From Swiss-Prot:
Recorded catalytic activity of this chain's protein: NAD(+) + (deoxyribonucleotide)n-3'-hydroxyl + 5'-phospho-(deoxyribonucleotide)m = (deoxyribonucleotide)n+m + AMP + beta-nicotinamide D-nucleotide
Any one Gene Ontology molecular-function term assigned to this protein's record: metal ion binding
PANTHER family membership: CHROMOSOME TRANSMISSION FIDELITY FACTOR 18, DNA LIGASE
InterPro entries: BRCT_dom, BRCT_dom_sf, DisA/LigA_HHH, DNA_ligase, DNA_ligase_AS, DNA_ligase_CS, DNAligase_adenylation, DNAligase_N
BRCT domain mapped to chain residues: 575-651
Cofactor: Mg(2+); Mn(2+)
Name under which the protein is recorded: DNA ligase
UniProt binding sites for Zn(2+): 389, 392, 405, 411
Pfam families: BRCT, DNA_ligase_aden, DNA_ligase_OB, HHH_2, Nlig-Ia
Active site residues per record: 108 (n6-amp-lysine intermediate)
């Protein structure tokens, strides 16, 4: 084999490797610009071989059924500077022999491409991009996405909708409590590619639709308007222009405001607006000639990693954080970066003293993407993750990728974080009681557990707070007034405020809606009657976490002490006028649009009574896929049977 052939093979192997990391595993190790550079090098060595490559992604994941795309899901050509955009516009003008062409500009969402098929208005299939020609079947998972249309009114024949699935930055921060995911795209990919759709249903997936195949629209702008009318989520940021200046103006406007968006974008997509002209332009084997992705300049910088320190969170998870020599990235001074977990440190071989490349994306904490091993001194040791908690000295426990301190009642860091969570905006929202004040009161032994907050006024009668810097009569009065005003709270916020592991806002709301009152919830949990939670589809992790929490006598005492100072409002229901009020309902089979637990919660909120067995008193059987023997029995008993679509319309 010649040196040139060896180089070609090496480049091809590198490209294939990075294709799998990006498209299948959603764990890219290099930037888009570096990836494009590999492709350019291969093209320079053997243009013809490169031009005949078929793949535009990665092979489909073997765990999923395969779906062949009737029209390939091609990738887009990229540009990284204004010259690339100008070249694209000039090229299509020459091809079409036109002086002016209307271009639609849209943000490029940093998510996962999907395709959804509808037959006579009914949602029947969803697939990932895969290699562009064959994708993975993710129908049941896409069906769980909140607000995703399952039926389109007045649509006949086959219609295909394409778009991008993502997780918002705010949802990502809530979801990633245990630092399981590196970024929102990674979280979205992991959520969409679950073999169990019930897991996907609990993840905050969202989507934007941008393409319609099988419609009668004449332009891309009409396509977006049609998608909106059909009930799909469409990105509001878009602009029509016929000039290079207009294209660049939109790029600059979005570039400047991108950090105000609650989702990641990595550039702008330019599309020829006229669909007839798109068809005339056609495509190469990899990308349509009618579109271009103008990627944002990578927001990277190199700096030195001084030290890796460990933070202990509310649930005891130990998270490594990099302390950096401060560096300016995109106008922001960065001095810390997330290292996620010990597996991430090992995979990238990150060591204290390394020169590292930092990437800043959106509002997510900056990340280390690469180590400059050439700058590393020979005697720099590997980082050893601690086997004891740096805050309390307890032996840690390994749980998957997470390392946890088990001493939740004795570890100062965990107690302080729990107190911070309890008073946070989405929980009790006590103004004036932030991290600084909590640590201050903790060190003075005035607040050592949650109930102490509500007896702080009593304790301060025997303590001269005004002697301490920053505290005067007014600030003390304001704090005590803020605490007093938060003695009445809704059940869902109360459950969320406790900081129980895996109980976020969504699960807290599900529990509140199911149990309706605090007494119902407390009595059920403290009597170990959490089997119901598992049946409802809230999940094994949540059920086990609740069991663990209520098995601790100190938690039971804390709840009893705390609730003595509070009024916890039951869930109000406007179910009296509901069609389902006082109706007895039984569920059977698999539901596609929501988990069984969510369906039962919705039914209870509407006033229905849920039963696990059929009888002549049953009003409705809600039948999903593979309903089993209950379906036959319902027919024998004369019970009215509703399919999932009918059920969705009711609730």
């Amino acid at each position: 084999m010649t040196d040139l052939e060896k180089m070609r093979e090496k480049l091809q192997n590198q490209i294939n490797y990075h294709n799998i990391l990006y498209y299948q595993k959603s764990k890219p190790e290099i930037s888009d610009a570096e990836y494009d550079e590999l492709k350019k090098k291969l093209a320079a060595i053997e243009p013809e071989a490169y031009a005949t490559q078929d793949s535009v992604g990665a092979p489909p994941d073997e765990r999923f059924s395969k779906v062949e795309h009737q029209e390939p899901m091609l990738s887009l050509e990229n540009a990284y500077d204004e010259q690339g955009v100008e070249k694209f516009l000039s090229k299509i003008k020459r091809f079409l022999i036109a002086d002016e062409i209307e271009i639609l500009c849209e943000p490029k969402i940093d998510g996962l491409s999907f395709s959804a098929i509808y037959e006579d208005g009914k949602f029947v299939k969803a697939a990932t991009r895969g290699d562009g020609f064959v994708g993975e079947d993710v129908t049941h998972n896409v069906a769980t996405i909140k607000g995703f249309p399952k039926f389109l009114q007045d649509v006949q024949g086959r219609l295909e909708v394409r778009g991008e699935i993502y997780i918002s930055n705010s949802d990502f921060l809530k979801l990633n409590e245990n630092n399981e995911f590196a970024n929102p795209r990674n979280a979205a990919a992991g959520s969409l590619k679950q073999l169990n759709a019930n897991i996907t249903a609990k993840r905050p997936l969202r989507y934007f639709a941008y393409s319609l195949i099988g419609g009668i629209e004449k332009s891309q702008s009409e396509v977006l308007e049609k998608l909106e009318k059909l009930g799909f989520c469409v990105n509001e940021h878009r602009s029509l222009t016929s000039s290079l200046n207009g294209m660049l103006k939109f790029y600059n406007e979005i570039y400047d405001c991108r950090y105000n968006l609650d989702y990641d974008i990595d550039g702008i997509v330019y599309k020829v607006n006229d669909l007839v002209l798109q068809s005339r332009l056609g495509s190469t084997h990899k990308a349509p000639r009618s579109a271009l992705a103008y990627k944002f300049s990578a927001i990277y910088a190199k700096t030195k990693l001084n030290k890796i320190f460990i933070q202990v969170g509310r649930t005891g998870v130990l998270t490594p954080v990099a302390d950096l020599v401060p560096v300016n990235i995109g106008g922001v001074l960065v001095s810390r970066a997330s290292l996620h977990n010990q597996d991430e440190i090992k995979r990238k071989d990150i060591r204290e003293g390394d020169v590292v490349t930092i990437k800043r994306a959106g509002d997510v904490i900056p990340q280390i993407v690469k180590v400059d091993e050439g700058s590393r001194h020979t005697n720099m040791p590997e980082f050893v993750f601690p086997d004891i908690c740096p805050e309390c000295g307890s032996k840690v426990q390994i749980e998957g990728v997470a390392v946890r301190c088990p001493e939740e009642f004795n570890c100062k860091a965990q107690i302080v974080e729990k107190l911070k969570h309890f008073v946070s905006k989405d929980a009790f929202d006590i103004v004036g009681l932030g991290e600084k004040q909590i640590k201050f009161f903790y060190d003075l032994e005035l607040i050592r557990q949650i109930p102490d907050i509500f007896i702080l006024e009593e304790r301060l009668k025997e303590f001269s707070l005004k002697e301490h810097h920053g505290w005067g009569e007014k600030s003390i009065a304001n704090l005590l007034s803020a605490i007093q005003s938060r003695r009445v709270i809704s059940l869902d916020r109360f459950i969320f405020s406790l900081g129980i592991r895996f109980i976020g806002q969504v699960v807290a709301e599900l529990l509140a809606n199911y149990y309706v009152s605090y007494d119902n919830w407390y009595n059920s949990m403290s009597s170990n009657d959490v089997e119901l939670v598992g049946i409802d589809g809230i999940g094994e992790k949540v059920a086990e976490s609740l069991k663990s929490f209520f098995s601790q006598e100190r938690n039971i005492k804390m709840l009893n002490d705390l609730t003595a100072y509070l009024q916890i409002l039951p869930v109000s229901s406007n179910s009296s006028d509901s069609f389902l009020n006082n109706k007895i309902i039984v569920f059977t089979g698999k539901l596609r649009a929501m988990s069984r637990g969510e369906a039962k919660v919705r039914a209870k909120v509407l006033g229905a009574k849920i039963s696990s067995s059929l009888s002549t008193k049953t009003d409705y059987l809600i039948a999903g896929e593979d309903p089993g023997s209950k379906y036959k029995k319902a027919m024998e008993l004369g019970v009215e049977i509703l399919d999932e679509e009918q059920w969705n319309r009711l609730c």
